[in-house]
A protein has these predicted regions:
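Structured beta-strand-rich core segments of catalytic domains in phosphoester-bond hydrolases
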Residues: 4-5, 10-13, 17, 23-118, ...
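Extracytoplasmic/periplasmic, Sec-exported soluble proteins
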Residues: 4-8, 21, 35, 63, ...
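A long, amphipathic alpha-helix that forms part
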Residues: 135-161
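Short glycine/proline- and acidic residue-enriched helix-loop micro-motifs
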Residues: 28, 129-140
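Metal-dependent phosphoester-hydrolase catalytic domains
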Residues: 151-164, 169-243
Length: 243
């Protein structure tokens, strides 16, 4: 969350305050007990225009909490966590009450490759020439991520309501994880884009699409695109749905 900067100096929070979105779904949210860093109460106050919230943290210790957060202008009910045998990954589920309709929301942060800075630089510069350690990390993370995705996909398949699935899937659009979700869900970006790349993560001159807004709604979204913003290594993804 902007490297845990205070709200007054946090580019991510400033962007969210100005977004005028009805629903904010955040992953990798860091809040601290130490008031020199961003605290949970400070985050709530900075986004107090949203009366309904859901905080779902995976990592707890005496100083830091880390996980997902949802801020909404619509009521959130039936909140629960989908946990994995992973120290830093989580999926959060809740139902959004939009007028007389109910939408089931899945906010996700799936397994990453956990590359060091030098490893990431190497992969982005030479994606087809990686060393043994990098290959092992890719294989291990891909397997873990697909297991996580199967757990979420099972919940999606049994949802009694239309589904909105968002977040950092750490998966390319040709990956098994992405294709598993596409068995049941539409990709809002593909439905509304016109030859745009849609990169949501950038390192140097290379960008990739690993963050998504997937859904089982009708009608289709009127817009879905990454938004240029600072403060994070991921670009925020914004979509508009009209009932």
């Amino acid at each position: 969350m902007g490297q845990a900067r205070k709200a007054s100096d946090n580019a991510v929070i400033k962007f969210l305050q100005q977004s005028d979105a009805d629903l904010l779904c955040l992953q990798e949210v860091d809040v601290y007990k130490n008031p020199e860093h961003l605290t949970l109460s400070e985050l709530k106050n900075a986004l107090k225009q949203y009366p309904y919230t859901y905080f779902d943290f995976k990592v707890y210790n005496s100083r830091r909490q880390f996980g997902n957060a949802v801020f909404s202008r619509y009521p959130l009910v039936n909140k629960h966590t989908i946990r994995y045998p992973s120290r830093a990954n989580i999926s959060s589920c809740c139902d959004i009450l939009v007028g007389e309709d109910t939408v089931r929301l899945f906010t996700n942060h799936l397994e990453s490759y956990r590359f060091t800075t030098s490893e990431l630089d190497s992969v982005m510069a030479h994606p087809f020439h990686t060393d043994t350690i990098i290959r092992q990390k890719v294989l291990s993370a891909s397997r873990s991520r697909f297991r996580q995705a199967r757990i979420v996909a099972d919940s999606v398949a049994t949802s009694p309501y239309p589904v909105l699935l968002v977040g950092d899937l750490n998966s390319l659009p040709v990956s098994p994880t992405y294709l598993l979700f596409r068995l049941k869900l539409e990709d809002a970006f593909l439905q509304s884009s016109s030859l745009r790349l849609g990169n949501t993560f950038r390192k140097g001159r290379i960008g990739i699409r690993i963050d998504y807004i997937l859904h089982s709604f009708f009608p289709t979204p009127t817009d879905c695109r990454p938004v240029q913003a600072t403060g994070s290594d991921h670009l925020p993804l914004q979509a508009t749905f009209v009932w």
